[in-house]
Design a protein with these regions (language model features):
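Non-catalytic alpha-helical coupling and interface elements of nucleotide-dependent molecular machines
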Residues: 40, 70, 83, 87, ...
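Alpha-helix capping and helix-loop boundary segments enriched in small/acidic/polar residues
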Residues: 3-4, 22, 51-52, 69, ...
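Juxtamembrane and boundary regions of transmembrane helices in multi-pass small-molecule transporters
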Residues: 6, 65, 127-142, 146-214, ...
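Hydrophobic alpha-helical membrane segments of integral membrane proteins
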Residues: 27-32, 110-117, 137, 149-153, ...
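Transmembrane alpha-helix interface/packing and boundary motifs in multi-pass membrane proteins
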Residues: 14-23, 100-109, 141-152, 237-244, ...
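Membrane-embedded alpha-helical segments and adjacent helix-loop junctions characteristic
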Residues: 13, 27, 31-34, 38-128, ...
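Active-site-proximal structural scaffolding
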Residues: 114, 138, 175-176, 188, ...
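Hydrophobic transmembrane alpha-helices of multi-pass small-molecule transporters
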Residues: 1-60, 64-66, 176-303, 319
Length: 366
């Protein structure tokens, strides 16, 4: 059996485990990397090369910087302030929650932002006699599409950039996703205000029910809130300016170190704020991606996919097809796992057609 066929079989097994989650995603990814080494698809010394990838460092650093905003209570304070500015009318409250959700989730954890804003939304809704069920769903949507705006907004964006870098191509800049993220966010907000609100449930929620937050604020010290906000702002500015003497991952780690040194969060909180599943999933899939490239499995998939699309599909058709596949897969599996699985395949297809891999990868990540 040729190495390419072995790699394809392994990829199919990984995809099956990703969809069914019979075993944890991180275990599947790391197991896939180990299998690549055992099958001789890549040299043994490359099996854990993903753990030293600079993208892993970027992930870890930004998880900590973002968590500092939650632990100091700054994220919740911003949410409360914005909601009070917009008022308690149904439409104005919905707009305020969506705007703050979009803005915060563009640089912070989507889930963390949503969990942080939920008590704010419930409290305001209870005081203003607004049905909370009509505010929570638009807010959750906003936290989802807000993550598309920047490179660090959501793990699939960073995974896509890492896949490009691993393939020897330039990765995405910090605000490159904004070309899609901002118009999509504006369209989403307008849709919810003009059409979506009529489709929302009208059931009342118990305002006193306990909401389990991803990260509880451990302090409301104004000084620490200001420090955590300044750290995030400086990180975003430095990443956006893309200085040659300091990389994205260096910026993220420096920001994380300053967060701990200034007491915005403890060392233990910093460790717990890192999404280790995302870290190991990405680190495990990088060697699998390398194996696909070296064995020719990626090219086989690309040739097969191109053949299914008529032999000479336009880059637009390829992008639409991969976007649709990604949307379909994320209904059954983690969006992070979906991106890790599809990005290397998308790059292989783009190379086969001499198309821009960035456009294809961006469509998959979005």
């Amino acid at each position: 059996m040729s190495p390419a066929i072995k790699c394809l079989i392994l990829l199919a097994v990984i995809a099956l485990f990703f969809v069914t989650e019979i075993i944890p995603l991180a275990i599947t990814a790391i197991g896939g990397a180990v299998a690549c080494g055992l099958l001789g698809l890549i040299p043994a010394k490359q099996v854990f090369s993903g753990l030293s990838n600079s993208t892993v460092v970027l992930f870890a650093g930004m998880f900590v910087v973002g968590a500092a905003m939650f632990y100091t209570g700054l994220a919740q304070a911003i949410g409360e302030k914005v909601v009070h500015i917009f008022g308690t009318g149904e439409n104005s409250l919905m707009l305020g929650l969506m705007l703050v959700g979009t803005a915060l989730s563009s640089v912070l954890s989507n889930t963390g932002t949503c969990a942080c804003l939920m008590p704010v939304a419930l409290g305001i809704c209870a005081a203003s006699k607004n049905p909370a069920s009509r505010q929570l769903l638009p807010m959750a949507y906003a936290c989802g599409w807000g993550g598309i705006i920047t490179l660090v907004g959501t793990p699939p964006n960073i995974i896509g950039s890492g896949a490009l870098t691993a393939a020897g191509l330039p990765g995405f800049s910090f605000f490159e996703f904004a070309w899609i993220g901002i118009p999509l966010s504006v369209a989403g907000i307008l849709y919810m205000l003009l059409i979506g609100k009529y489709l929302l449930p009208k059931a009342e929620l118990d305002a006193d029910q306990e909401i389990e937050q991803e990260i509880e604020a451990t302090t409301h010290d104004k000084k620490k809130q200001m420090i955590s906000g300044m750290i995030l702002l400086v990180c975003v500015i430095v990443m956006a300016l893309d200085f040659k003497f300091i990389s994205l991952e260096m910026t993220a780690i420096i920001g994380a170190l300053v967060c701990v040194l200034t007491g915005c969060l403890t060392e233990k909180q910093a460790y717990s704020s890192i999404d280790w599943v995302t870290i190991f999933l990405f680190a495990g899939m990088m060697p699998v991606s390398t194996a696909m490239d070296k064995t020719g499995a990626g090219k086989l998939i690309a040739n097969w996919a191109v053949g299914l699309m008529g032999g000479e599909p336009t880059p637009l058709i390829v992008t639409i097809v991969l976007f649709s596949i990604s949307c379909f897969l994320t209904q059954f599996m983690s969006n992070t796992a979906s991106a890790a699985l599809l990005c290397p395949i998308g790059i292989a297809i783009a190379k086969q057609l001499n198309a821009d891999p960035k456009a294809v990868v961006m469509a998959i990540a979005v």
